[in-house]
């Protein structure tokens, strides 16, 4: 840290290293206490930041000792007093002694001393820059006053330049020319009036006898690098926090730096402008810079401020570095102020001096650095005329925006009305569609009944046939087909549509007789020519097994019918048992009929029947456990071990009457090639997927309102309410008795409802009237309460009035909610595409799970969320992404399945229980209104209200019933429990699935585009074109990231820097040389931004 010697050949660089010498022998390490003391002393000399000090303090003792030895090997060459004494001797032209004065008189001797002074200044600059902080503080202390000495020498070195400038000024008078030196050296440091006395001792006192010699010596000094090196010394001092504060508080220092612009060396001028620009960016520095140029104007005789600066800028067009520094300084001094008006003023100063015209000439300059600084200034220009036009345009835009907002509000209202109307129409159409489907199903059943009965067995009066009979033959035929598929029976068809059934023997163990009753083997024949047979007897009796009964006729009861039922009226012949009524699915098989059941002679004894319930499925479930019409599923053996889909499967007994009875996942698996699916989703070492717990809806419980009112507070609140109503007590009571809602207002009525007289208050009022006390004793609130309590049926009237006011809004609010529930429920239940989507999901889930958990016959809707959690082996896609691709390739007609589902989001936001409660509340209110009208049938308000709103109430009741039935039906249809499933829970499952499906579609499409782009990119190099153009953006990516980070930081950090640390001035100079200054127009605080055109990295 302590080079004390510099090099004359390298003025701005570090000191020349001394010749290499062998390292001295290492000294032994002292004791720990002494080592720590010497280490702390070395750290203090280094002037390091706290983080570096903390880092070095963590060194071990060996490294600390090496650091101490390195620090102590370096010795400062000269103390600060030596440099100060030499500088004083160069400036002291008055002569400390006659010998010194005589030496100054010799021109040859002075030139020799100038050479020596230049070398001394270089060594001083190196010492100020490299020595430890203690050396610098000693140089600047009150005893040495190194800053004052340095400024005296700087003023002496450039006084001749100022004098020559004034001598060549055509407008100067002779009297002014006779005293240039006094003005140039004493008035340089003029500052504020309070600081003038303080600055007088810093100026050079030249007598008339010595002035000519001093000017001659100053000219010799100014031709050397002394001014440049002096500025370098001041820059080194300002790089320390204490030195910067001393310079900024000095009344003449910045003035002398600004006057150094008159130096002939362009490199010195550029150095001065960089230093002044950095000072301008420090808090309070801008005012000091402007004061320095005011002083410059006075000393140099300018007519306008910055006149000489613009003259140098125009004339020094051969030195690009100076022009860049000059343009940078002008940009910062103009646009770094926060006051916009002051900024315009400074901008016009340079416009008046011809800057804009000169920049137009420099527009085609070849220097990139200069072009960047010029463009930064042009970008910062504050155009008042354009701002005025923008203001006028903004006002017009604001007015237009208000109009557009009004139009948007109007269109939004119209859209909401149109949406409600369309929702009502869709709900009505869904209800009509549902009714039409029911009628179609009824017609199909009648047609099936008539076809199954045949012309010979058809009863003469079809209307007397049992309504539920048509459903039995189809179930019987289904059972026969099922037994045939299982290989338990064989159907033989003979000539003349004769049908016989042969039971195939199965070697099984004898079943136990009581747990699950075994249905008899159902047989059926569509032919009417078959002779009637007795009811089939189930094979659940203990061995030996009973003989199998014959085939029953189509009009006979199925096996589950109870025996000994009376015959139906109007039948041609009485059947042995009546058919089961109703449209419900067939119940489980009943116990075997008694042995006395009538019937034809049975055929010869068949082989023993199969065990009860048929063969078990993969999980050991028999047919009796699967439910009627449910076919047992076999587990699927996959090639690879598949992960388990975490769905909630339904039991076979739970799918009766649901959508899953209509799904055939085995057909889907036969249509798809699952080998690709296995490859992408086979198990790898992966954690178990999250198990979605069953969601439970909790009814919101309203906290009971507490109303514990003290009498005084109640009276005070009543007074406030009456003031809001702004009506007298008698007028209020008359309006209540006449049901005049317009006079009272709904809000006022709701407030009055809180002040209905209590039993205690009524007793007080009764006693007051019985005692016949004067009304004057009562307050205004009490008199109102007295009048208020005299209204007959007051609670009923107040409730009716409140109901009259709330009914239209409440009905208008409830109707769209009911329509949303109806439309959403019916559209979900009637969507064939949604059923096919669920069929595909069921197929894939069984393909993954059946080998371990057995085949599932259905699943909970919440299992759809698990599709997003199941990841492929490479973790790049989910099961939902794969399903989207399969549907797009194999089932393209299903891609828009969500277009069949209406108003799911609106229906999901409806609380059906609350809506139904509100409807019931409206119904009770309407009934109360009707009772009031019966008691007061001459009231036209009640009569008109009942006439206008009774149809609305009837429609609300009908829609609420339809909505409740539709919702419960669709919930049960999908295997959920309507008692525990709310609309918000049910419809949100579909909404989430649709959103996830759409997002997966977009991602799959994006993947396809990226894959196509990669393929196209892979084909391009094969055409002989190297992919070189793509390399520069990749190479510049770190630089662009740095620029983005700089912009992000600088948008958060203000422009005004704080000089609260060492090295701040160097950092500012580095920043402004690297990053062009850009001011945000219209912002109170400017910002530094980084232009992408600069290829340099900015140190932070």
Curated annotation (Swiss-Prot):
Top-level taxon in the UniProt lineage: Eukaryota
SMART domains on file: Drf_FH3, Drf_GBD, FH2
Entry keyword annotation includes Ligase: no
Domain FH2, residue spans: 632-1023
Region (Disordered): 1-31, 167-200, 446-474, 510-635, 1008-1037
Tissues of expression: Expressed in heart, brain, placenta, lung, liver, skeletal muscle, kidney and pancreas.
Domain DAD: 1059-1090
Any GO molecular function: actin filament binding
PTM sites of type Phosphoserine: 7, 184, 624, 693, 1031
Lipidation (N-myristoyl glycine): 2
GO cellular component terms attached to this protein's record: bleb; cell cortex; cytosol; extracellular exosome; membrane; phagocytic vesicle; plasma membrane
Modified how: Myristoylation mediates membrane localization and blebbing.
Keyword annotations: Cell membrane, Cell projection, Cytoplasm, Cytoplasmic vesicle, Lipoprotein, Membrane, Myristate, Phosphoprotein
Residue ranges of domain GBD/FH3 in the record: 27-468
A Pfam cross-reference name: FH2
Compartment(s) where it occurs, according to its Swiss-Prot or TrEMBL record: Cytoplasm; Cell membrane; Cytoplasmic vesicle, Phagosome
Task performed by this protein: May play a role in the control of cell motility and survival of macrophages. Plays a role in the regulation of cell morphology and cytoskeletal organization. Required in the cortical actin filament dynamics and cell shape.
Description of its domains: The DAD domain regulates activation via by an autoinhibitory interaction with the N-terminus. This autoinhibition is released upon competitive binding of an activated GTPase. The release of DAD allows the FH2 domain to then nucleate and elongate nonbranched actin filaments.
Family classification: Belongs to the formin homology family.
Protein name, entry field: Formin-like protein 1
Organism: Homo sapiens (Human)
């Amino acid at each position: 840290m302590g080079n004390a010697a510099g090099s004359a050949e390298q003025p701005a660089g570090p000191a020349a290293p001394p010749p290499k010498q062998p390292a001295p022998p290492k000294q032994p390490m002292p004791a720990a206490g002494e080592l720590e003391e010497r280490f702390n002393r070395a750290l203090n000399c280094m002037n390091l930041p706290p983080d570096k000090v903390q880092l070095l303090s963590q060194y071990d003792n060996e490294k600390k000792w090496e650091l101490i030895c390195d620090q102590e090997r370096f010795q400062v060459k000269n103390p600060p007093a030596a440099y100060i004494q030499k500088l004083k001797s160069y400036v002291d032209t008055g002569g400390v002694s006659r010998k010194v004065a005589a030496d100054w008189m010799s021109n040859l001797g002075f030139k020799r001393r100038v050479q020596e002074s230049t070398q001394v200044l270089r060594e001083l600059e190196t010492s100020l820059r490299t020595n430890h902080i203690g050396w610098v503080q000693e140089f600047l202390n009150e005893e040495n006053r190194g800053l004052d000495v340095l400024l005296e020498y700087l003023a002496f070195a450039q006084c001749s330049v100022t004098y020559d400038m004034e001598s060549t000024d055509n407008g100067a008078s002779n009297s002014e020319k006779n005293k240039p030196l006094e003005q140039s050296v004493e008035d340089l440091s003029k500052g504020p009036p309070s600081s003038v006395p303080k600055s007088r001792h810093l100026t050079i006192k030249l007598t008339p006898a010595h002035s000519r010699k001093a000017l001659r010596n100053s000219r010799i000094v100014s031709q050397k690098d002394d001014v440049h090196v002096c500025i370098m010394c001041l820059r080194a001092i300002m790089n320390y926090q204490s030195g910067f504060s001393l310079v900024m508080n000095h009344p003449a220092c910045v003035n002398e730096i600004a006057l150094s612009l008159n130096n002939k060396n362009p490199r010195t001028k550029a150095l001065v402008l960089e230093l002044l620009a950095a000072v301008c960016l420090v808090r309070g520095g801008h005012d000091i810079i402007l004061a320095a140029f005011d002083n410059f104007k006075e000393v140099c005789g300018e007519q306008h401020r910055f006149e000489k600066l613009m003259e140098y800028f125009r004339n020094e067009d051969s030195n690009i570095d100076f022009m860049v520094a000059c343009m940078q300084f002008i940009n910062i001094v103009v646009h770094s102020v926060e006051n916009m008006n002051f900024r315009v003023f400074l901008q016009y100063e340079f416009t008046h001096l011809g800057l804009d015209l000169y920049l137009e000439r420099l527009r085609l300059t070849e220097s990139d650095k200069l072009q960047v600084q010029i463009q930064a200034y042009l970008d910062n220009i504050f155009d008042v005329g354009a701002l005025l036009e923008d203001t006028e345009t903004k006002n017009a835009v604001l007015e237009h925006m208000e109009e557009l907002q009004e139009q948007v509000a109007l269109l939004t209202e119209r859209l909401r009305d149109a949406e409600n109307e369309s929702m009502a129409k869709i709900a009505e159409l869904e209800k009509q569609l549902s009714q039409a489907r029911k009628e179609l199903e009824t017609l199909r059943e009648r047609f099936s009944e008539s076809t199954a009965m045949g012309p010979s067995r058809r009863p003469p009066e079809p209307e007397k046939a049992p309504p539920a009979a048509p459903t039995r033959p189809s179930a019987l035929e289904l059972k026969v087909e099922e037994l045939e598929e299982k290989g338990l029976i064989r159907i033989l068809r003979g000539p003349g549509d004769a049908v016989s059934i042969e039971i195939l023997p199965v070697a099984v163990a004898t079943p136990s007789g009581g747990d699950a009753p075994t249905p008899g083997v159902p047989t059926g024949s569509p032919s009417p020519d078959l002779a009637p047979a007795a009811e089939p007897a189930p094979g659940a009796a203990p061995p030996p097994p009973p003989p199998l009964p014959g085939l029953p006729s189509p009009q006979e009861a199925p096996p589950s019918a109870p025996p000994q039922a009376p015959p139906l009226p109007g039948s041609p012949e009485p059947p042995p048992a009546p058919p089961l009524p109703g449209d419900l699915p067939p119940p489980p098989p009943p116990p075997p009929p008694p042995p006395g059941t009538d019937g034809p002679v049975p055929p010869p004894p068949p082989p023993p029947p199969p065990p009860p319930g048929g063969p078990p499925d993969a999980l050991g479930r028999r047919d009796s456990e699967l439910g009627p019409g449910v076919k047992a599923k076999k587990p699927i053996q996959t090639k690879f071990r598949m992960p388990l889909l975490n769905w909630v499967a339904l039991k076979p007994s739970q799918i009766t009457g649901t959508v899953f009875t209509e799904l055939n996942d085995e057909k889907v698996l036969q249509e798809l090639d699952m080998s690709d699916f296995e490859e992408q989703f086979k198990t790898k070492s992966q954690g178990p997927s999250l198990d979605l717990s069953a969601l439970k809806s909790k009814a919101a419980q309203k906290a009971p309102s507490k109303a514990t009112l003290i009498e005084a507070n109640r009276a005070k609140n009543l007074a406030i309410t009456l003031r809001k109503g702004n009506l007298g007590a008698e007028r209020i009571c008359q309006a209540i008795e006449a049901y005049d809602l317009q006079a009272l207002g709904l809000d006022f009525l709701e407030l009055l409802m809180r002040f209905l007289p209590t039993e205690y208050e009524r007793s007080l009022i009764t006693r007051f009237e019985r005692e016949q006390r004067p009304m004057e004793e009562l307050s205004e609130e009490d008199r109102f309460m007295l009048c208020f309590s005299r209204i007959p049926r007051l609670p009923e009237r107040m409730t009716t009035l409140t109901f009259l006011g709330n009914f239209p809004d409440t009905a208008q609010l409830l109707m769209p909610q009911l329509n949303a529930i109806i439309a959403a429920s019916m559209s979900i239940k009637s969507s064939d595409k949604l059923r096919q989507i669920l069929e595909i999901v069921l197929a894939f889930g069984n393909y993954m799970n059946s080998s371990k958990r057995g085949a599932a016959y259905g699943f909970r809707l919440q299992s759809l969320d698990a599709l997003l959690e199941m990841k492929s082996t490479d973790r790049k896609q989910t099961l939902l992404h794969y399903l989207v691709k399969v549907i797009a390739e194999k089932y393209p007609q299903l891609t828009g399945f969500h277009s069949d589902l209406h108003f799911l989001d609106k229906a999901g936001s409806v609380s059906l229980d609350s809506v139904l409660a509100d409807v019931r509340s409206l119904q009770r209110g309407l009934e109360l209104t009707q009772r009031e009208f019966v008691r007061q049938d001459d009231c036209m308000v009640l009569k008109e209200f009942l006439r206008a709103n009774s149809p609305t109430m009837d429609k609300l009741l009908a829609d609420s019933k339809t909505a409740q039935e539709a919702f419960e039906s669709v919930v049960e249809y999908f295997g959920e429990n309507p008692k525990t499933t709310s609309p918000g829970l049910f419809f949100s499952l579909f909404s989430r699935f649709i959103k996830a499906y759409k997002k997966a579609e977009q991602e799959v499409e994006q993947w396809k585009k990226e894959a196509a782009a990669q393929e196209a990119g892979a084909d391009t190099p094969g055409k002989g074109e190297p992919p070189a153009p793509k390399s520069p953006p990749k190479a510049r990516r770190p630089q662009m990231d740095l620029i983005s980070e700089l912009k992000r930081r600088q948008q958060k950090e203000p422009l005004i820097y704080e000089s609260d640390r060492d090295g701040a001035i160097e950092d500012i100079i580095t920043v402004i040389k690297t990053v062009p200054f850009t001011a945000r127009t219209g912002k109170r605080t400017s910002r530094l931004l980084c232009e992408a055109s600069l290829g340099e990295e900015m140190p932070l």
